[in-house]
Each structure stands twice: as C-alpha cells, then as structure tokens.
Regions:
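Short amphipathic, positively biased membrane-proximal segments
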Residues: 1-7
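Short, conserved catalytic-motif segment at the N-terminal edge
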Residues: 35, 41-108, 128-130, 144-152, ...
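Short, conserved phosphate/pyrophosphate- and ester-handling motifs at nucleotide-, phospho-/glycolipid
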Residues: 50, 113, 312
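Active-site SXXK
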Residues: 55-62, 81-86, 106-135, 143, ...
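Extracellular/periplasmic catalytic domains that process cell-envelope and extracellular macromolecules
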Residues: 67-69, 98-100, 130, 173-180, ...
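Short, well-ordered beta-strand elements
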Residues: 244, 395-397, 403-412
Length: 431
C-alpha cells in the first residue's frame, strides 16, 4: 500500500493548503517534524506536472512490492522549487508488518558520494585546493605509485579491466606515468582500488575498530594501481573518495563528519543525515530483510565519504533541490551556479563505462553520472541531468533543464524499480 503524506513543516509531503483533496489519498496520522524551514509545496499542475501521471509512481512501486523484489520505498519529486510528490510505499519492517514511514532512515551507501563532491568543491571555491592538485601534495605517501600490467607481452603494458582475485594472471609492475590527482579520484579515473589487477595483487589494509580517515588513508598508498591514471573509468567503491575526504580534513582543519554537518547538513536542514544514527532515531531505520546486523553495528569513528551515511528522503530532496537551485536553498548559497555546473558536467569525454559496459550517451562529473544524450543512453532523464545511487537501491538526481529533483529510497537494489520510478517522474512532466 502507498501513502501520500500531509505533514506539518513538510516531513516529506505536499501541504494540504496547496493540494486539492481529490488529488490525494490522505492517510493518518499527521506527523510533526521540527525543521528550520519547510520545503515549499505546490499542486503538480502549477509547476507543469500531472497529478494523475504522478500516481503512476505508486502503481510502479506497488507492482515491485507485490513481486517481492522490494519491501518498500519512499519517493519524492520537486519541480521549479516546489515539492509535488512525497509518498511512502510498502513496509519498513517486513517481519513486524510495520508500514513505511515518511521519515524512515535508509542506509545511503554510495549515495554518500555526491555529498563529498559538494564538500570538495566548496574548498575549490575558497581557493584552498585545486582539482588537478596531486594527492601527494596533501598525503606524501601517494608520491610514487606503481601500476600492475600483464607479464606478457613485454613490449606492451596491458592492464586488464577485470581479473580473478583468487588467481591473478602473471604480472609485473611499472611506474605510474604521472601522479594521481584529486580530479582522478573524483571521476574514478585514478586506478586506485577499482577492481582490476592492481587491486587483486594488493594486500588490503586492516582497519582497526577505532580507525579514522587520518589513520587509514595513508595506508591506501600501498595499493598497486589498476591502470595508468586518467586512462580509464573504473569505479572505486570504497577507497578513492575516502582519500579526498581526508584531503578535505587536512585543508579545512576539520574532521570530515563535522565539515559536512556544519557546511552542508545544517544549512540545508538535513537533520536526519548521520554517519552514526543517534539512539533516539534508531527506531526509524528501515529493517532490511536478511541484514538485521545493521541495527547492531557499533558507532564508527571512520567517516566514509564513499558510503557511510544514513538519511531520509526529505533530507536528500533538500540536497538535490540545492543543486537544482544553482547551489542555493533558503537563501543560503553553498556553491555558485558555475561550480554546480562543474560538479554535474562530463569531465571524461567517452571514458565512462557504467561498470560492465560502454555507456554511450553518458558521462561522469565529480562524483555523479551525467546524461549527455538521453536517446543514445536509453535514459528517461534530460540531457544535463546528473546524480548517483547506492548499493541498497537509493537513487537521487538533479535535472537542471526541467528544474527537477527526484529521490528514490529503497533498501533492495532492484534496477527495474529504479527505472520505473525515473520513467514515471519524467512522463509526468506536461509543460
């Protein structure tokens, strides 16, 4: 069952004063969420969207819930600065049959990464670092990296895209042609811990229970690179962007968790976004089927920019709406419009591969995938739209052309549900 919420202060919904009752299936109870400032709301038709067509989001989510592929979801859409859709679907806890709630807290996994992208570009704007800076400028251990190549042929340096980690092929090491840069890490073109030959032959550093970015990131320099820096796109899921987070700490003089809280979460009113979910909020976490150990995890001191956050649909809608607004929300300018374009522009030509295949029509910016040609890419998003997702199924994106922000919160990575949500959002645009 899907529920459209009427919430005081927008805990994630469309305000009653802005929506005709006939347009809504209203559920109770009304939830009071304290927010520094509510996201504005509107009737979909007032911002060029169709109420009837937006209901297809609910139909699509329910279909995937009925199939057993997802347990539930929260979906949110804003256009032209106004929230037009915020809906809960399915169950927050399957075993207890607890319905999904508007303020449910989800594990964001790699949906954390665009937060780092914004944090880094804040320091670029302040002149404290440059994307083309070598990593060794801040962390000297990365000064002289090596690249793994196949042993044969001897007259060519070939770095395979993927290898069997348990039985890597015969290989040799060659010096990196140049140092890896912040740009390389933000675009996943560094070759650091990205699943190739170098990763297979490298010993993963052991992380202690009291590890921090400061203690762990220098150890990453022990990795052998998977390919020459800048020559390929290959996703570094858990290492590369943590290096950038450590640079943010060094340059700003502030721990990464405090930096993003003070500079991003607090100004945007993202009050439910945490590396460690506070005790009084743990009951709001989605109970993921077959992953009950999430609730038993001890607090961490390792604030991973690659995948450490938990958050809500409303909080991520605030983040995406800031990007739609050219770096501004509630009169608070986090980035300039030009810098937002830097974040969401393709920096790689045709290097982007989308994990397992060439992704024609797509590119990659700073921590986000970018639609270049939606027809060629088979994407329902507009040219210029950018965003990213997480391993548990979360997705969010910004569409500057349509002035649209969309958030899908899942805890099962099911691509048909992700596609159907994006399709339902785009087909609801009528002006």
């Amino acid at each position: 069952m899907s529920r459209i919420w009427l919430l005081v202060g927008l805990g994630g919904a469309v305000a009653a004063s802005a929506v005709e009752q006939d347009d809504l299936l209203v559920s109770s109870p009304v939830i009071q969420l304290e927010r520094p400032q509510a996201l504005p709301t509107a009737r979909p038709e007032d911002v060029g969207m169709s109420s009837q067509r937006l209901r297809r989001i609910s139909t699509a989510m329910q279909r995937h819930i009925d199939s057993g592929r997802i347990q539930g979801a929260v979906t949110a859409v804003a256009r032209r600065g106004k929230v037009v859709h915020f809906e809960t679907h399915g169950l927050m806890d399957v075993d207890s049959h607890r319905a999904m709630e508007a303020d449910a807290i989800f594990r964001m996994a790699s949906s954390t990464k665009p937060i780092l992208g914004v944090a880094t570009l804040m320091l670029v704007e302040e002149g404290l670092l440059r994307p083309r800076d070598p990593v060794s400028k801040y962390i000297p251990e990365f000064k002289a990296m090596q690249v793994a190549v196949l042993n044969e042929p001897q007259d060519q340096d070939i770095s395979p895209v993927r290898v069997n980690r348990r039985d890597p092929p015969a290989h040799r090491l060659v010096p990196a042609n140049r140092e890896i840069t912040i740009h390389d890490l933000l675009t996943h073109t560094s070759g650091l811990a990205s699943g190739g030959l170098g990763s297979a032959i490298s010993k993963r550093p052991r992380r202690d229970s009291n590890a921090t970015l400061a203690t762990e990131v220098p150890k990453y320099a022990q990795y052998v690179l998977d390919f020459q820096p800048g020559s390929r796109w290959s996703y570094s899921p858990g290492v590369g962007l943590n290096v950038v987070a450590r640079i943010v700490e060094i340059v700003s003089g502030t721990a990464f968790n405090h930096f993003v809280h003070d500079r991003i979460f607090e100004p945007l009113g993202m009050q439910d976004t945490h590396f460690n979910v506070p005790d009084h909020k743990t009951s709001r976490r989605v109970v993921i089927r077959n992953r009950s150990n999430w609730s038993r995890r001890p607090p961490t001191t390792f604030f991973s920019a690659s995948g450490g956050l938990s958050s809500t649909a409303e909080d991520y809608l605030r983040f995406e709406q800031m990007l739609v607004g050219g770096g501004q929300l509630f009169g608070r300018q986090l980035l300039s419009p030009r810098t937002v374009r830097m974040l969401g522009s393709n920096h790689l030509g045709d290097l982007y591969r989308s994990f397992s295949r060439n992704q024609n029509g797509m590119g990659y910016g700073y921590t986000v995938a970018v639609v270049i040609d939606p027809i060629i890419a088979g994407s329902r998003r507009s040219a210029g739209a950018f965003g990213w997702g997480g391993a548990f199924g979360t997705q969010s994106w910004t569409d500057p052309v349509e002035q649209l922000a969309a958030v899908l919160m899942l805890q099962q990575p099911y691509s048909p549900a992700q596609y159907d949500f994006g399709n339902a959002v785009q087909q609801a645009i009528i002006d």
